């Protein structure tokens, strides 16, 4: 998306992370533009306020979400790295762990650029070992997606590459625990409810999932894993004010 002539055309580049700024310096060391990093914020208060108990029940019924579940919300593009997640699930279930959990995926199980990768994913997901514990919901409506996220035990985000992840920003507003791949942008974006893992190590991820699920099941940690949405929205407004001030510095 960034041409070699961009620095001759634009005097200023606005990027979503310091990690992206480092990439700019790495790939275009001769650029002459001023770089501004502005972290965007998910403004989802209207959608969150639309999540009523009735909607939550309808989502549970529609998608048959009767058991505790872990949510993986990304599209199935190869850089989103679902392979480490499904291999971790396979590892857990082969060892007889978390057999009473579901692993919920949204997004379309297609990637025209990497059909062999999708075939590899599908082979594991449809195997006898894991198929009973995996739910592929496809594309879901935005408010339904947030309701699914809200009621998950926790979220897993295994990406190998992100700009500034919307999934994590949404999870922050819902005040959810998120297991994050330890890529630089996630280290920059994480908050205190994030747990980092090596995105190339399914066994480490399996252990992190099992440990997090065990903690989530304890009564003394119930509130932590349910999330404090009121606090999440307050944090969203605080970060939105910082975002607005940053944009003012750039454009005014």
What is each stretch, according to the model?
Residues 64-80, 86-89, 104:
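Conserved donor-binding/catalytic core segment of Leloir-type glycosyltransferases
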Residues 118-143:
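Nucleotide-activated donor-binding/catalytic signature segment of Leloir-type glycosyltransferases, i.e.
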Residues 160:
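Aromatic "clamp/platform" in nucleotide-sugar-dependent glycosyltransferases that forms part
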């Amino acid at each position: 998306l960034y041409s070699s002539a961009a620095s001759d055309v634009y005097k200023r580049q606005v990027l979503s992370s310091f990690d992206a700024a480092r990439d700019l310096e790495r790939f275009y060391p001769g650029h002459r533009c001023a770089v501004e990093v502005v972290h965007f914020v998910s403004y989802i208060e209207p959608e969150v306020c639309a999540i009523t108990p009735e909607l939550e029940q309808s989502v549970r019924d529609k998608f048959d979400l009767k058991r505790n579940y872990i949510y993986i919300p990304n599209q199935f593009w190869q850089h989103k790295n679902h392979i480490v997640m499904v291999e971790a699930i396979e590892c857990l279930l082969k060892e007889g762990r978390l057999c009473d959990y579901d692993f919920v995926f949204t997004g379309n199980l297609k990637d025209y650029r990497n059909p062999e990768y999708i075939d590899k994913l599908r082979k594991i997901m449809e195997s006898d070992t894991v198929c009973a514990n995996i739910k592929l919901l496809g594309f879901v409506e935005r408010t339904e997606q947030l309701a699914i996220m809200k009621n998950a035990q926790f979220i897993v985000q295994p990406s190998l590459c992100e700009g500034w992840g919307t999934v994590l920003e949404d999870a922050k507003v819902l005040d959810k625990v998120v297991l994050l791949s330890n890529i630089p942008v996630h280290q920059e974006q994480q908050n205190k409810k994030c747990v980092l893992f090596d995105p190339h190590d399914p066994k480490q991820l399996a252990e992190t999932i099992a440990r997090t699920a065990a903690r989530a099941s304890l009564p003394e940690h119930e509130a932590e894993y349910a999330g404090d949405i009121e606090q999440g929205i307050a944090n969203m407004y605080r970060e939105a004010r910082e975002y607005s001030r940053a944009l003012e510095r750039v454009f005014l």
